[in-house]
Amino acid sequence: MKRGKSKYLLLSSGNMVINIDYEEALHFHRKHNADVTLIYQKVPADCPEKGYTLTLSDKDRVLELHKPATLSDGDNKFLGCILIDCEIFQDSIEKSYAEGYHHFIGDVLATSLKRLRVFGYQFKGYARRVTSVESYFQVNMDLLDPRTWRELLNPNPQHRIYTKINDEAPAKYMEEAKASNCLIANGCIIEGTVENSIFFRRVKVGRNAVVKNSIIMQYTEIGDDARLDHVICDKNTVIQQEAALSGTDEQPLCIGKKAVL
């Protein structure tokens, strides 16, 4: 960092599912002559997450940064994304290390709100943190909403998410297959009934099998007459004929890689 020529540094949480244009946040940062800009979102009424919240002035200045036991409807939830001037970040890290501090948010930023010009930039799109099996399951289920899917996987080249390409034949639906509200990847063969589920490539669903509210990863085979509901199957799993597996929204049943059940 000392040898770099960049004026600004972007720190972003690795467990946040979000598609954000940081150019707009950078414009906000410059417009307010900020030392630090924290990106936040208004908490929706059904948000089960925990984390830091921001108390803001009417001019978007951060007055307080704290971590309540639970988040409430309308709280300003910090998304773990920070724009900061490089020199200020470097000075803050060196100072906190010398004083024995280890947490940049709680130990450094939260105690520097009067010394630094810290502002909050509101993000109004989809943003969810994956911190548990439950939240992983819920974020995947959110993709079944076309509005969420289009926002996260935006076809606009400036916002597009690039992934590894793996060409396969199109999914094949047999005569008795029934599919509703699913994301089904190439290479899948569907002979049974699938609802509200996500299927990775080359999944096979047998005759009269029923899969609901589940995440089925690649190369999984689901036998004839099997029943799955609220299940997460890792790749290369084999679910035998007439097997019945189920979980709940809060506790989806997880099947390990290469398991045979």
PLM feature spans:
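Unchanged
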Residues: 1-141, 255
